[in-house]
Amino acid sequence: MCRKLFCLALMAMTLGFLSCSDDSGETPPAVKNVWGITYSHKNLGAYPDLFSKYWVYAYETSKNPDVGLRISGEYPDTRFFSFSVYNDMTGEVIDGLDDVHITPDKGSVNPYLATTESKGNRFTVYLLKQGTDLSLFPGAKEGNVCYFTDDVECLTVCLRHYLGVDEFGGVSLPVVEGVNLRTGKTVTTPDAVVSRATVMRQGNYEHVASDDNNEVPFILAPRGAYFPNNSTDYLFCRTKLTTDQVLSFSFIPVPVPSRVEDYLGARARYWSICIGSLQNTFSYSSFYDKMLSYPENEKITVIVVSANNPRLAEVKKAAADIPYSYVMEWDETIVDAHGKAIGDIIAIMYRNILPDNTWEHSIKNMEPVVSYGDPYSMVTNPETQIAHIALGDYGPLGVKQTTGEFLNKRK
């Protein structure tokens, strides 16, 4: 989200892929594992959710101009899964498919639309160049196709899982095969290249004036050009939190469904709060909707405090008396992969997956503010850009206090 240059990553050496030769499609090509390693908050920046997993495959379309992709596999057992397609050179999202919109193969059912006991339900999706003749791919369903354009030189596909039953959602990762866009025949899957999505980035950690403000508004993050999740919108704030401060905010969370049958038409599929370091854009603390018991349409209170606050135990005890509250600790002394302490300048993300833009309180209807520099200085229309103004009780507003002020208020 932060518009900073990418820095060299450790991950590049971990993406070991098989080499392959060109194939006309006349001889059935060998299936290759192109997904590489599993990514998570431990090895990926841009403030990922702690409850998500990612797999990335990138190939050079400029060197494979007549090759698209067929991706087939079993529906995973997750809270949510999706495919996102990016222009790897720019990081901009091109297309994507969410679980509820992936039509199952013949004889299978989509378990994200109805509860089912059946196993082995399968899907097939295609990545094709715009203008491709779909009649060449009899198995392709219009709704299961993502498209890219001629000007894309390198294409990245990202598979996302949220809250899977295990690392891979209880199934094998989908098989990726190359397809000839002119003939429809299966060809060798293009060699994988290192995607910019997996390259560690530095954060926007310079101190700005608003970091010291005691009032900490939330604003809508722009989609940006760094591999955003096309299914998700985010409210965020940034601030400096010292070891003698407590940050708290209250709001009514977006309603989320408890049954698969209610996924379609939900106000949002999932929400979470995560805290990351402005220094490296990694996330270190997070919780999601089902981790807190609260009545629908009631306010919750999130309390953020340094793990090194000398009165931490007192803060936790006071928080226990606040209805529907959750305490999040931040340890500014943690040392990251660059050998630097993650510091006390933090970003807090309120994530909504598949927010419903027809709902009057949806963050989808807010106007984004740029997320680099001092974002609060760039607000031009508070009525649509500041969450607690635009959304009322559904929009969080952070307030920082000294530890003493926080505790005295609750005596």
Model-derived features with residue positions:
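Sec-dependent bacterial lipoprotein signal peptides
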Residues: 1-18
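Bacterial Sec-dependent N-terminal signal peptides
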Residues: 13-33
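A compositional/structural signature for long, glycine/proline-rich flexible linkers
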Residues: 27-411
